[in-house]
């Protein structure tokens, strides 16, 4: 009888521990920063954040300002002009080229002029303005702009003093602003374009590379699933391209999955694959592509109805096979909207987006919970 009592006592203890573990919630308070819901934040390095405090989000309880936080302390703050709510024409955003070049972009909707100001040595520079189409890509050595003129598309490169370095004509298929583009060491440009015509049931993506004078070097056509979101892209230093986009089956709201396509610098398609998990929404949000075609992808896996909230990191080889996986739990006291972001040094963080105080959690701080069966096919 004593042995039986000890057995049941041990069983109850194990069950209570298991229940406590299953209901454990991650405390985000140590990771919260002073912010409002959907406040723009850029991660510069561990515990260093560039924050755009927007008075319109908090009823001007806190003034619109550019703030630099270092380990939770404000080391820089500059108030910005408030816009009248009945006639706004100025918008602010943040930009980061690398760990040393970052700052504020101010866009004037009435003149289509964008002003870029770097934050250097505790001072916001006077900056420079560029007029025209408002889609820019900040890179360590230059600022790129997608420019349309007289029915043609150009990628223009400016140095960080605002001086035009080059203007490269690109394909008639317009580069999508949200897919990204990059300038390689030989001044050629790699970029992603998509060509979607719903009436003709045509869904295509292109990985493109052009020389500095606009000569087409490679074009890789890729068929897409018929319901996709805006594709994003990662580029290797030698011009390889990895595009990724959320997708779903026609007519279904959930679950959605991620569609991946990778090509090399010579315009050869390495693979196209769909990353899925049964009854779970998967979204790739960040990727790093290397010269040999291997890649690291980060993303979220969630299903609110199942109270399943995870983030993941997958290592892929050049053929798109999963070499290793790292899945972390992100169960919190509320059903947050969250994403995975990288800083310029390559460190990964989980960032909440829909709470009054944004939390930025280093990926490595989250508990391992590998309970997802990934399918990459």
Where are these regions (language model features)?
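An edge-strand/N-cap motif at the start of beta-rich repeat modules
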Residues: 22-57, 72
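Short loop/turn motifs that cap or connect beta-strands within the blades
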Residues: 26-36, 77-85, 127-132, 167-174, ...
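A short loop-to-beta-strand structural motif that recurs across blades of beta-propeller domains
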Residues: 63-67, 114-117, 152-156, 204-208, ...
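Repeated scaffold domains used in trafficking and secretory/extracellular systems
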Residues: 35-44, 85-97, 130-140, 174-184, ...
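Blade-level signature of beta-propeller repeat domains, shared across WD40, Kelch, NHL, RCC1
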Residues: 336-377
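Bacterial N-terminal signal peptides
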Residues: 10-20
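Short glycine/acidic-enriched loop and turn motifs that connect beta-strands
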Residues: 55-60, 107-111, 149-152, 195-200, ...
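Entry beta-strands of beta-propeller and related beta-repeat scaffolds
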Residues: 47-50, 100-103, 141-144, 187-191, ...
């Amino acid at each position: 009888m004593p042995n039986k009592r000890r057995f049941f006592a041990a069983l109850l203890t194990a069950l209570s521990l298991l229940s406590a573990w299953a209901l454990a919630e991650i405390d985000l308070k140590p990771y919260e920063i002073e912010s409002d819901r959907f406040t723009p934040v850029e991660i510069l390095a561990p515990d260093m954040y560039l924050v755009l405090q927007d008075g319109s989000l908090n009823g001007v309880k806190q003034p619109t300002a550019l703030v630099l936080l270092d380990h939770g302390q404000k080391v820089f703050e500059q108030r910005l002009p408030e816009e009248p709510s009945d006639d706004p024409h100025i918008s602010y955003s943040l930009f980061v080229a690398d760990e040393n070049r970052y700052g504020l972009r101010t866009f004037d909707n009435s003149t289509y002029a964008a002003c870029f100001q770097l934050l250097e040595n505790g001072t916001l520079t006077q900056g420079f303005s560029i007029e025209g189409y408002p889609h820019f890509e900040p890179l360590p050595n230059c600022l790129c702009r997608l420019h349309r003129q007289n029915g043609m598309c150009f990628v223009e490169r400016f140095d960080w003093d605002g001086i035009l370095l080059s203007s490269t004509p690109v394909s008639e298929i317009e580069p999508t602003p949200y897919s990204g583009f990059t300038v390689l060491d030989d001044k050629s440009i790699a970029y992603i374009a998509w060509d979607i015509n719903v009436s003709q049931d045509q869904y295509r993506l292109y990985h493109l590379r052009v020389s500095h004078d606009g000569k087409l070097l490679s074009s890789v056509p890729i068929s897409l699933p018929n319901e996709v979101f805006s594709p994003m892209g990662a580029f290797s230093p030698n011009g390889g391209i990895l595009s990724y986009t959320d997708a779903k089956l026609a007519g279904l709201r959930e679950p959605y999955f991620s569609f991946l396509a990778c090509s090399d610098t010579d315009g050869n398609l390495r693979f196209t694959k769909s990353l899925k998990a049964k009854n779970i929404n998967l979204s790739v949000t960040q990727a790093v592509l290397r010269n040999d075609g291997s890649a690291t992808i980060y993303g979220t896996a969630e299903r609110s109805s199942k109270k399943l909230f995870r983030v993941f990191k997958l290592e892929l080889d050049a053929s798109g096979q999963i070499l290793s996986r790292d899945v972390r739990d992100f169960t919190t006291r509320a059903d947050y909207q969250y994403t995975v972001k990288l800083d310029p040094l390559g460190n990964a963080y989980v960032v909440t987006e829909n709470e009054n105080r944004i939390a930025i959690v280093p990926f490595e701080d989250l508990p391992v919970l590998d309970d997802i069966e990934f399918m990459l096919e």
